UniProtKB/Swiss-Prot annotation:
Annotated transmembrane regions: none
Entry annotated with the keyword Transmembrane: no
Pathway listed: Glycan metabolism; osmoregulated periplasmic glucan (OPG) biosynthesis
HAMAP family reported in the protein's UniProt record: MdoD_OpgD (MF_01068)
Cellular component GO terms, alphabetical: outer membrane-bounded periplasmic space
Official protein name in the record: Glucans biosynthesis protein D
Cell compartments where the protein resides: Periplasm
Similarity field: Belongs to the OpgD/OpgG family.
Species in which this protein is naturally found: Xylella fastidiosa (strain M12)
Gene: opgD
One Pfam family cited in the UniProt record for this chain: MdoG
PTMs per UniProt: Predicted to be exported by the Tat system. The position of the signal peptide cleavage has not been experimentally proven.
Keywords assigned: Periplasm, Signal
Amino acid sequence: MLMYRRDFLKSVTAAWVAFGLPNPLGGAFATNRVIALRRLGQSQRFDYELLKERARALAAAPYHSRKRVLPTPLERLSWDQYQSIRYRQDHALWADSDAHFQVKFFHLGLYFHSPVRMYEVVDGMAQELAYDPAAFDYGSSGLNGKGLPKDLGFAGFRLNTRKDTDRDFAAFLGASYFRAVGQEGQYGQSARGLAVNTGSSGPEEFPDFIAYYLEQPTSDADTVVMYGLLDSPSIAGAYRFSITHADVLRMDIDSALYPRETIERLGIAPCTSMYQVGENDRRMGWDWRPEIHDTDGLFLWTGNGEWIWRPLCNPLHLRFNMFLDNNPRGFGLLQRDRDFDHYQDDGVFYEKRPCLWVEPKHGWGEGSVQLVEIPTFDETFDNIVAFWNPRNKPHPGQELLFGYRLYWGALPPVSSSLAYCVATRTGLGGVVGQKRKYFSWRFAVDFVGGKLAALARVHDVSVEPVLHMTRGRPEIVSARPLHEIRGYRVMFDVVPLEDSAQQIDIRLYLRDTNGEPLTETWLYQWMPPILEERKIY
């Protein structure tokens, strides 16, 4: 399962790397003349209810794969050749209108073998858009469009604004994957329409959006509305997206899901990211760059109002975590570290990668936010997944309705009055200058915000760290002001049991003299080395 997942995600991620950049060809093939896309067949009445009925009908019928064997020249494209194929600006959907938004399409080839049908919706009527080889510039691919089937189809699409036709702000490409950016303009983590059996003992399933319906916006609209029809061996679904382009881009999503079979682990609103090396985990720290990650932590706002921060890791083995909840208020994968000096990468700009925050629109009931961390040696492999898993397994014949909002930007749209964690550092424990008699592991956790800046200026104030561990023992526990960050640093050592290399779950927060919390809750999982590898130097 992991090899299949690794191959699948690595191929998709590699393609995203290219399409996350501005069009290298710029306006080289842009013209003032706009060529309207050819339409297929007759327009038909369309709305979200009709799409849900179609998804329900799909689920009632046997599944069939839409993957096709592509013409040999497309199959043999290298990565560089494929990414040089660009949709022509003069063929962009809505380029012949005064709408604020435009759509450009991705070509099939390389890793993308499943045609996705594209429809335009105008005044409640949908009509399919025809693939046209002449709508693409084939760059250095060695192709010229001649000889390609007229009904080849598209792989996906991207959204631009009329003011910036070279850089997209959202894109849908590969299975049910999509991405967006905020004002930073830098792609990073992905979202998916649905996750099926991620991190389970069996093979993971990757549902596909098999059709998109793009609703023509009015000239003054700041929101573009689109719909997606999803299908896979175990489930079908209908989606409605309302995408508002802003400094923090917002997607308002409604989904209706229709299982074909019982699903072991259903993932709602999945976020997919990459974490290779960070301040707290340098297991893969042979790269010259200090840190390599799209996001550095999972942020939770639970149904009972608790704020939780869980730093990410690149584990030695697959790691799976469940955070039980009832009607969660939100969760997401965040990139809190925004300092270029911590990454030193002027090519992919990890410090500009967007956070992705999931906000349920109504009560989701009982279930859990689940976090899957997969070992990776390679930053082109997305190894982090977080999603909501309903407590009850879906069964055939059900209709499952989930509404939520996705926010893409430098910060999530919600914040707590409590202080928050800005850094987690780890290393060998002990007292500097004294010979170590046994193995321990040091944790240094920095908190800023809330009341901490004011408290840090008062010398006689008492701030108490509250620390819990599932095994082992804590040593040298302290919480002291750190004026350089206008906050507090908590430090402690963990001494593992001599006869156990089992993971240790750690829970930490700061409280005042009245027992009131001053910070969010910091959670961590540490896997101590086996006894033979516990070097004390």
